[in-house]
Amino acid sequence: MESQQDFPHFLPGQEDGDSQRWGRGKRIGIIGGRGQMGRLFGRFFEAQGYQVVIADHDAGEGNEEIIRISDLVLFAVPLHETVSIIRDLIPYTRPEQLLMDLSSLKVGPIQEMLRSPSSIVGLHPMFGGSISSFAGQTMVACPARIDSREWSTMRQLFENQGMRIKECTPEKHDYMMSIIQVLFHVTTMVTGRVLRELAVDVAETMEFTSPSYRLEMNLLGRIFAQNPALYSAITQMNPFTRDVLDHLEAGLKRYKEWYNADDLSAFVSDFKRSAEHLGDFCGLAFEESSALLDFSVELARTRTEDRNQKTEGGNEKAEMRR
C-alpha cells in the first residue's frame, strides 16, 4: 500500500530547486473559491502575502483562466465533483505550477493530478470552514510529487499558523478515513434511520435522557445538520467502504444471533475482547468524556433556565396586555 512506487513523494534530483518558487507574493488560484473551505483558505493565503484569485459558479475568473494565470492552484470543490473538475483542467496545467486539493479523499484526486506535468500535494483539512483559528487543527498532507525543499517551505507555511501536519500516502489516508469517517458516519446515519423508522420523538427522549445519551444525540444531530451530499460522497467514494460495511453487517448479524439465542455471555465476552483491543485508550476516553458530559449537563441546565425565563417573560407581557 505504501510502496515508493505507488507514492512518489519527492522528485529525485531536484534538491537544489528554488524553494521560493511558490512563496509569498505568488498568485494562488482557488477553484471553488466561494465555498466555505475555499473562502477559509483564501483568507489564509491572503494573510500570508499571496495574491488570491478565485473561480466559482457565480464569481471570479473561469477555471481555465485560473490555471493559466496562477503559480499555485487549489481545488476546493465538492468531493463528488473533484476528480472530474481536475480531469477537465489537466490540459491547461504547466510544469512550474503546484496543484493542491482539499478533498476528503486522496487516491482519486491525486491520481488525476499526477496526469499533469505539475508538482502535486493533496491536502485534507480535518476541520470545517467555520473555525476561528488554525491553531491546534490537524491537516493531512500527501506530498505526491514535489521537491523536498519546496514541500518543506509549504509545510512550514501551514505549521506557522499552528496547524499540525500529518503526512501519509493517499492509500493510507483513504484507509484511515474509512475508519475515522465512514465507520462512524454510517453508524450515525443508520441510527438516524432507525429513529425515523421507529417514529421516535427525539424531544420526548430528552426528557428521559442521561448525560451520555444527550452528548451522543448532539453528535448525531450535528451530522444531520450538515451537507448530505458531502457525507454521502465520503461514504460512497472511499475505496475501503465495502470492507467497513461488510464488518458492520457481520457484527450486527452476530449480535442478532446472540439476542435470539438469549446468549448474554456472548455479549459479555465480545465486549471484553473489544475493551482489551482498545487497551489504555478506554481509561483516557472515560476521563475525557466525563469532562465533556459535565459540560454538556451544565450547558443543558443553562439553556433550560433561559427558556424558562423567556416563557415567564412572555406570560408577563400577555398578562399586561389583558
Task: Give the residues covered by each predicted segment.
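Rossmann-fold dinucleotide-binding core
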Residues: 105-106, 112-177
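Active-site-proximal catalytic alpha-helix in oxidoreductases
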Residues: 173-202, 206-225
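Interdomain hinge/lid region at the active-site interface
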Residues: 204-285
